Each structure stands twice: as C-alpha cells, then as structure tokens.
Amino acid sequence: GAFKSGWNLGQEFVNMYLGHGGEFFKSGTAQPNVNNEKGVAALNVIKSLTELSNPDFLTQDTNAVKEEWESGNVALMHVWNSGASSLLDDEGDQAIRADTRLAPSPSVGGGSIPATTLWWDGIAIATNTSDENAEASFRALVGAASSAELANEYADATVWLIKDYKGGNTAGPVVDAATRGASPYPSFP
C-alpha cells in the first residue's frame, strides 16, 4: 500500500475510517471524533494490510507504488482515480497496461460503504490580482470546466460533473463509489 508517513498514511486512515462508517466530528461540533471503536478498527485494517505490503511501505507514496505496478512488482493496489489514468496510458510496459483493470473501491468491516472518499477539483485565483484579472480568470476556468467537448476530449483526466460527459476508462470506479455512498472528502464539521 501507499503508506508513506504523512499524507499517504493519513489518507488511508481516512479511507478506512469512513469505510467503517466513522464520522470525523462529533455531531454539531468541530470536536474530533476518531478515538473510538471505528478508529481502532480502521487502524487494525491498515496494520493487517502492512503484512501484505512492501517491507518499505512507510517510504512508499502513491507514485512509488504506481512505479512498482508498472514494473510488474505489485498485484493489487488502491489508488486515487486521478492517478489511475497514468496506468492506462501509452507509456511503460504495454503488456502490463493490457492486463491492468480498474475496479471499484472495496468496503471494509463487512459494510457496504466503499473505503474511499470523493474529492472534487476546484479552482483558485490569487488574491493579489486585479478584480478584472480575477473575473477574466474565473470566466475562463468556469467556461473550460463546463465544456462537454473539452470533458470528452480529456475523459480520462478526471471525472467531469457536467451534462453530456461520457465517462472514460477511469470513470467507472468513481461512479460506483458515489452510487454506493462514499463520503466526500472531509473538510469541515
């Protein structure tokens, strides 16, 4: 697994905790709520996965695991959808690419909720720009993000939330996760 200390390991906790039905905040508050039975269960799943992982799992981020996959050294991995498209591109060993299949995120603990999160891209505009430049940038970005033609040209770059988008090779697992009740990435209580 991609259990590199820091963000990657933290993200796997997020996946497993939400997959167990955990809530990050106590209801109606900003008080953390992970020191509980579901938090311990998430940690135990991660611990059990390390037994199946590369011995250097604490040094391997998603990119390192993808390199191992493309080298034929990994049989199964959990990767963000945005990173999956590079597994299906024309670079690297085409025999490995031909044998690569994307599957929906699994559930954990006997539940039905996928052990993943949905994280949608957004836009940001610098605060030190003029109002005119900010408005022009916003209009250009929103125009590009709402173009079905552009979305379908880059169907594997991301999953687009616009009318007439025809999902590419990587869209299936995201649609499945959303349909099965995956949580949005936690950002506030």
Name every feature range the model reports, one short phrase each:
Residues 62, 79-84:
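Beta->alpha turn/N-cap motifs
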Residues 9-16, 39-46, 65, 83, ...:
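Stable alpha-helical elements in mature extracytoplasmic
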Residues 23-25, 51-52, 129-136:
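Short helix-loop capping/hinge motifs at secondary-structure junctions, enriched
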Residues 28-59, 105:
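Glycine-centered hinge/linker elements that transmit conformational signals in sensory
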